[in-house]
Curated annotation (Swiss-Prot):
Co-factor note (free text): Binds 1 Mg(2+) ion per subunit.
EC number(s) recorded for this UniProt protein: 2.1.2.11
Protein name per its UniProtKB record: 3-methyl-2-oxobutanoate hydroxymethyltransferase
Sequence positions that bind Mg(2+): D44, D83, E114
Highest rank taxon of the organism: Archaea
CDD domains reported for this sequence: KPHMT-like (cd06557)
Positions bound to 3-methyl-2-oxobutanoate: D44, S45, D83, K112
Cell location: Cytoplasm
Job of this protein: Catalyzes the reversible reaction in which hydroxymethyl group from 5,10-methylenetetrahydrofolate is transferred onto alpha-ketoisovalerate to form ketopantoate.
Single Gene Ontology BP annotation: pantothenate biosynthetic process
The species this protein was found in: Pyrococcus abyssi (strain GE5 / Orsay)
Complex and partners: Homodecamer; pentamer of dimers.
GO CC term, one of those recorded: cytoplasm
Pathway it works in: Cofactor biosynthesis; coenzyme A biosynthesis
Length: 282
């Protein structure tokens, strides 16, 4: 069992901020764990930042299992959280249970489900089975078509009511935490005060119990990123510069240099081998 468990995350509420970051492969997960993140999250955002999809709706269970397995191999300390992709739990509770089990068997410590009140039965069943669940309300990318696109949530009484209802339903069903995405900070603060489980924000202000960002956004791997992101590096330019230099060296015959390859020390022996081999294959 890894050091950080759902129980540990619950105990951090109001005491220590929870740090969570996405990772989609072995090397990124290795670094995230070494950096000391509490939660390493295999998000369905991989559809967009890894596979170039316009949204998360086309991410499959097979993709999530594949990437979860890679991340789980790398992480020794942090809690490994895996997303339930669109279509993997909406049809029935039984279907959701089957797919959650696949992610746990791939090495996840917990699963995340978008939505709250509508999926309380599934959350309750999973928790009873021993599968920890994190909920997700506010802007739910898997439902962006219904929401009218990606926009900040919580500006109307109806939206605030829905967000609060979702969070409380998740709490009652046994979820150990809830993500609040792109929610007005006042509303995120209200939710944080109203539930006993930790709230983890993304674009929802400072009044939550923790924060999560996407790996590629933190590192500046794309030209554009969501407006709530703080870039901690601009690796796109650094990577582009490095690979451009490699291409230039290849074109100009500068790579490989003498230190990058090996030759026969005994040239006469190589001459003998060459003549022998060429006679045999002629």
């Amino acid at each position: 069992m890894r050091e950080i468990t759902p129980r540990k995350i619950i105990e951090m509420k109001g005491k220590e901020k929870i740090a969570m970051i996405t990772a989609y492969d072995y090397p990124s997960a290795l670094l995230a764990d070494k950096a000391g993140f509490d939660i390493v999250f295999v998000g369905d955002s991989l559809g967009m930042v890894v596979y170039g999809e316009p949204n998360t709706l086309n991410v499959s269970m097979e993709q999530m299992v594949f990437h979860t397995r890679a991340v789980a191999r790398a992480v020794k300390r942090a809690l490994v959280l895996a997303d339930m992709p669109f279509g993997s739990y909406e049809v029935s509770v039984e279907e959701g249970i089957k797919n959650a089990i696949k992610l746990i068997q791939a090495g996840a410590d917990a699963v995340k489900i978008e939505g709250g009140y509508d999926h309380k039965k599934l959350v309750k069943r999973l928790v009873r089975m021993g599968i920890p669940v994190m909920g997700h309300t506010g802007l739910t990318p898997q439902r962006y078509l219904r929401l009218g696109g990606y926009r900040i949530m919580g500006s109307t009484e109806e939206e605030v009511e829905e967000i609060i209802r979702d969070a409380k339903a998740l709490e009652k069903a046994g979820a150990f935490a809830v993500v609040l995405e792109f929610v007005l900070a006042d509303v995120a603060k209200l939710v944080t005060e109203e539930v006993s489980i930790p709230t983890i924000g993304i674009g929802s202000g400072p009044y939550v119990d923790g924060q999560v960002l996407v790996w590629h956004d933190v590192l500046g791997l794309y030209e554009e990123s969501p407006p709530f992101v703080k870039r901690y590096a601009n690796l796109r330019d650094e990577i582009l510069g490095a690979i451009s230099e490699f291409k230039k060296d290849v074109k100009e015959g500068k790579f490989p240099g003498r230190e990058h390859y090996w030759e026969f020390q005994d040239k006469e022996e190589f001459k003998r081998i060459k003549e022998s081999v060429l006679r045999k294959v002629d």
